[in-house]
Regions:
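Short acidic, glycine/proline-enriched helix-loop-strand junctions
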Residues: 64-79, 83-84, 92, 122-139
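Non-catalytic, surface-exposed connector residues within folded enzymatic/regulatory domains
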Residues: 22, 39-42, 62, 80, ...
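Acidic, PIN/NYN-like endoribonuclease modules and their adjacent C-terminal/linker elements
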Residues: 1-3, 103-139
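Short, well-structured N-terminal submotif of metal-dependent ribonuclease cores
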Residues: 1-40, 53-66, 136-139
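Alpha-helix capping/helix-boundary segments
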Residues: 10-11, 44, 82, 102, ...
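Phosphate- and divalent-cation-binding pockets in alpha/beta enzyme and binding domains
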Residues: 23, 47-48, 85, 123-124
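Active-site neighborhoods of divalent-metal-dependent phosphate/nucleic-acid chemistry enzymes
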Residues: 74-113, 117
Length: 139
């Protein structure tokens, strides 16, 4: 069974209705139908919370997290081992630390696929399966 690891950029694209939101909707529908699973690193969950709170205030954040929680995504805790693995990924692949948690999560099995709009993780493409969302249109 495919396990989609959504990072903060993928979730924000969904919430904002931006490029790639339709793909995320399809992934969520498949998850709800039991066709595949969706996991999110606690780091990315917190990143979504912070960005939504900054944009829309505490009430907006609470509403968005409630909406997302209803989907039943598995929020994967940050353990000491994951923190160290992510640090190694950051150093070896020269990607931002928070993004490294998505790469680490996608490395849990061959069934995992990282879904992201963040092209900083391209350096890890040879290590894990990554599905990149389309770039935002330039205005």
């Amino acid at each position: 069974m495919v396990i989609y690891a959504l990072d903060a950029s993928a979730i924000l694209r969904y919430l904002d209705g931006e490029a790639g939101a339709e793909l995320i909707k399809q992934i969520i529908k498949g998850h709800l139908a039991g066709k595949h699973r969706v996991v999110v690193s606690a780091i990315h969950w917190g990143e979504v919370a912070g960005i939504v709170c900054k944009r829309h205030g505490r009430g907006g954040m609470d509403a968005a997290l409630s909406r997302l929680s209803a989907f039943g995504f598995e929020i994967v805790a940050v353990t000491a081992n994951r923190a160290v693995n992510s640090a190694l990924i950051k150093v070896e692949r020269k990607i931002p630390y928070a993004d490294a948690f998505g790469v680490d999560l996608a490395g849990d099995s061959a069934e995992h696929v990282l879904v992201t709009a963040d092209f900083d993780v391209k350096a890890a493409e040879e290590d894990v399966r990554i599905e990149f969302l389309p770039p935002k249109p330039k205005h």
